[in-house]
Amino acid sequence: MRLSREARARLYGPTVGDRIRLADTNLILEVEEDWTLPPGEEAVFGGGKTVRDGMAQSQRSRSEGAPDLVITNAVVLDWWGVVKADVGVRDGRIVALGKAGNPDIMDGVTPGLEIGPGTEVISGQGRILTPGGIDVHIHFIAPQQAWEALFSGITTMTGGGTGPSEGTKATTCTPGPWYIHRMLEALEGLPLNFGLLGKGNASSPQALEEQILAGAIGLKIHEDWGATPAVIDTALTVAEAYDVQVAIHTDTLNESGFVEDTLAAFKGRTIHTFHSEGAGGGHAPDILRVVGYPNVLPSSTNPTMPYTVNTLDEHLDMLMVCHHLSPNIPEDVAFAESRIRPETMAAEDVLHDLGAISMMTSDSQAMGRVGEVILRTWQTAHKMKEERGPLPQDSTRNDNFRIRRYLAKYTINPAIAHGIAEYVGSIEPGKYADLVLWHPAFFGVKPDLVLKAGFIVATPMGDPNASIPTPEPVRYRPMFAAFGKALTRVSFTFVSQAALERGGLPAGLNRTLLPVRKTRGLTKKDMRLNDALPQVEVDPETYRVLVDGEEITSEPAKILPLAQRYFLF
């Protein structure tokens, strides 16, 4: 019996050469390899299907190596490629990608994917599997942020804060050991991975060291606490000693120096620059220059992404609220206005498309939207293809390289930058199975299924009193991985290695504690598919942006995909 490509795609999902449009964007994904081949013995669950006893299900017990979960026939999209594969999970970690089934009667079954009676199945055919998103610029203002992020496909959040205090609404810091401990305790009840940044603003090391020893995974320098060269040098010196990252919001007012002085204070040491365009804060008007330095790992925050006809209008009020400014004080208004430049906003989109800005983050409730990191990343990719055409690495058939570049901005690159890439950030054996399944029509905007360590944590679910799962009202709802002791088994807390070794953490934490590592000595070249180092200049009078001597800009978008069409109900 022979199947047409169309019939095979309907039954088993796309294979090599099949192409998928991502939601209502202009982005086309093409399957590059099919690891479930040869055809004819696909693992498919359901009535009359193959995953049955003696067929694609073997007699292997868990003790004999059968996986706990197999996701079948998914299109795996990650920074490293686009493949059709079955994915196996055991003990919460990915064990293999390849062909699942029963090796007693099937050829080519991948070791680790031998389906047994103890194996659960999630059907991935016709769906796209990506790593869970990682948002590393979180103001922990409200615990409800976690649900908004989770329901958008984010599974890891790092940042700082203590709730809706003035300090937290403006800065991404959890200051001092007492608050770090209380926040570590509070975050135990939310079903995502978390890590906390301590306050990095000090000219002497002792107060910074005690925060790292209390569990902080890094330090945040913020201009509202004083981002002076002395502060920068001290924070980076401490970070080098303890192998943690430093994130910085630089000095918008140029009070203690200009961008050149800040770059000099880095002394070539690795640092993560938040909202590198500057509307979120940073040396006016030319903080954007930092994206051309090899020791700088730059990110954007999502309110400026992508640049639209509405971007300018909303920023002034946002800024006044977030930074405790008064519209009645002329100096406060001037401070706010100095950060809002359409020219640098327009250039930011292009710098992302060139791979010069490596990460995308939210800046949650502090000039950013926690549930829109993924959505705005793909809106930007769409806008750039619309304006700039295919990337040189792509063809007229697909946008695979551009898609992988943009995916890396909220998955593997923030994981690398903050020392958690050995645990999360990509779909590779050995990493935790923090995964998101998407129907192509809803890709990037509404996930189909979110897993934490291989356990379903969230999904659109119909009326719980209905006879089947699908009747309206269909809403995002937490699933079993979000409850009871299971939550603490499949969601992890990142802490410093020093805190684990020296016993500086609060007693009674129930979650698995994982140390951050390998944050120092990173360079832009470690940012997957986003390692460009252009020379960037900003004209101090006109704010025009030059990249390697050529002016770059983009038009404000009037219409975007992944917008009202998906939020009518």
UniProtKB/Swiss-Prot annotation:
<dbReference type="InterPro" id="IPR011612">
    <property type="entry name" value="Urease_alpha_N_dom"/>
</dbReference>
<keyword id="KW-0533">Nickel</keyword>
<feature type="domain" description="Urease">
    <location>
        <begin position="132"/>
        <end position="569"/>
    </location>
</feature>
<dbReference type="GO" id="GO:0016151">
    <property type="term" value="F:nickel cation binding"/>
</dbReference>
<dbReference type="Pfam" id="PF00449">
    <property type="entry name" value="Urease_alpha"/>
</dbReference>
<keyword id="KW-0378">Hydrolase</keyword>
<feature type="active site" description="Proton donor">
    <location>
        <position position="323"/>
    </location>
</feature>
<feature type="modified residue" description="N6-carboxylysine">
    <location>
        <position position="220"/>
    </location>
</feature>
<keyword id="KW-0963">Cytoplasm</keyword>
<comment type="subunit">
    <text>Heterotrimer of UreA (gamma), UreB (beta) and UreC (alpha) subunits. Three heterotrimers associate to form the active enzyme.</text>
</comment>
<feature type="binding site">
    <location>
        <position position="363"/>
    </location>
    <ligand>
        <name>Ni(2+) 1</name>
    </ligand>
</feature>
<dbReference type="GO" id="GO:0009039">
    <property type="term" value="F:urease activity"/>
</dbReference>
<dbReference type="InterPro" id="IPR017950">
    <property type="entry name" value="Urease_AS"/>
</dbReference>
<feature type="binding site">
    <location>
        <position position="249"/>
    </location>
    <ligand>
        <name>Ni(2+) 2</name>
    </ligand>
</feature>
<dbReference type="Pfam" id="PF01979">
    <property type="entry name" value="Amidohydro_1"/>
</dbReference>
<protein>
    <recommendedName>
        <fullName>Urease subunit alpha</fullName>
        <ecNumber>3.5.1.5</ecNumber>
    </recommendedName>
</protein>
<comment type="pathway">
    <text>Nitrogen metabolism; urea degradation; CO(2) and NH(3) from urea (urease route): step 1/1.</text>
</comment>
<feature type="binding site">
    <location>
        <position position="137"/>
    </location>
    <ligand>
        <name>Ni(2+) 1</name>
    </ligand>
</feature>
<comment type="similarity">
    <text>Belongs to the metallo-dependent hydrolases superfamily. Urease alpha subunit family.</text>
</comment>
<dbReference type="InterPro" id="IPR050112">
    <property type="entry name" value="Urease_alpha_subunit"/>
</dbReference>
<dbReference type="InterPro" id="IPR005848">
    <property type="entry name" value="Urease_asu"/>
</dbReference>
<dbReference type="InterPro" id="IPR011059">
    <property type="entry name" value="Metal-dep_hydrolase_composite"/>
</dbReference>
<feature type="binding site" description="via carbamate group">
    <location>
        <position position="220"/>
    </location>
    <ligand>
        <name>Ni(2+) 2</name>
    </ligand>
</feature>
<dbReference type="InterPro" id="IPR032466">
    <property type="entry name" value="Metal_Hydrolase"/>
</dbReference>
<dbReference type="GO" id="GO:0005737">
    <property type="term" value="C:cytoplasm"/>
</dbReference>
<dbReference type="GO" id="GO:0043419">
    <property type="term" value="P:urea catabolic process"/>
</dbReference>
<dbReference type="InterPro" id="IPR017951">
    <property type="entry name" value="Urease_asu_c"/>
</dbReference>
<feature type="binding site">
    <location>
        <position position="139"/>
    </location>
    <ligand>
        <name>Ni(2+) 1</name>
    </ligand>
</feature>
<feature type="binding site">
    <location>
        <position position="222"/>
    </location>
    <ligand>
        <name>substrate</name>
    </ligand>
</feature>
<keyword id="KW-0479">Metal-binding</keyword>
<dbReference type="InterPro" id="IPR006680">
    <property type="entry name" value="Amidohydro-rel"/>
</dbReference>
<feature type="binding site">
    <location>
        <position position="275"/>
    </location>
    <ligand>
        <name>Ni(2+) 2</name>
    </ligand>
</feature>
<feature type="binding site" description="via carbamate group">
    <location>
        <position position="220"/>
    </location>
    <ligand>
        <name>Ni(2+) 1</name>
    </ligand>
</feature>
